[in-house]
Curated annotation (Swiss-Prot):
It comes from Megascolia flavifrons. GO terms for molecular function: toxin activity. Disulfide bonds: none annotated. This is Megascoliakinin. One of its GO terms (biological process) is positive regulation of smooth muscle contraction.
Amino acid sequence: RPPGFTPFRKA
């Protein structure tokens, strides 16, 4: 997962 990964931002 990249450092900015969240389940709310899986663009």
